[in-house]
Amino acid sequence: MPRSSFSGSLSSPKLDVVIDMGNPFLNLTVDGFLKIGAVAATRSVAEDTFHIIRKGSISSNDFEKSLKKMCKEGAYWGAIAGVYVGMEYGVERIRGTRDWKNAMFGGAVTGALVSAASNNKKDKIAVDAITGAAIATAAEFINYLT
């Protein structure tokens, strides 16, 4: 009986930039900042490009606004990633073990810090800390599955 099959593979390009700050904590924090900051900046550019194409024209004001938004988003999300990675690494060093609890604690502290920096009230800070912990823990569990 004749059979046909299809096979293929998909691999993503990988780019690693290493900046040696002389301290593993700083190395991981800067790495997280740069990687997530670049993703946020790229997302911002893609979103603004979509809106410009939809509008049908571009002005120097649109370009300047897009560039400012790209830098702002990259710095914001990069800083959040840097705090999270730094907290997770710090907890790992203190506890002496690497597991999902480090991610949970890092996510909780990062969520609380971001919320407090946004001048939210105590209840909202607590909810954001729980959300940060839940997201970080879920991401860690998903990484264990793959």
From Swiss-Prot:
GO CC terms in record: chloroplast outer membrane; etioplast membrane; pore complex
Region of interest called Contains 4 beta strands, as start-end residue ranges on this chain: 1-73
Key words of the record: Chloroplast, Ion transport, Membrane, Plastid, Plastid outer membrane, Porin, Transmembrane, Transmembrane beta strand, Transmembrane helix, Transport
Transmembrane segments: 75-91, 103-119, 128-146
Location in or out of the cell: Plastid, Chloroplast outer membrane; Plastid, Etioplast membrane
GO biological process terms held by the UniProt record: monoatomic ion transport; protein import into chloroplast stroma
Keyword Membrane on entry: yes
The name this protein goes by in its record: Outer envelope pore protein 16, chloroplastic
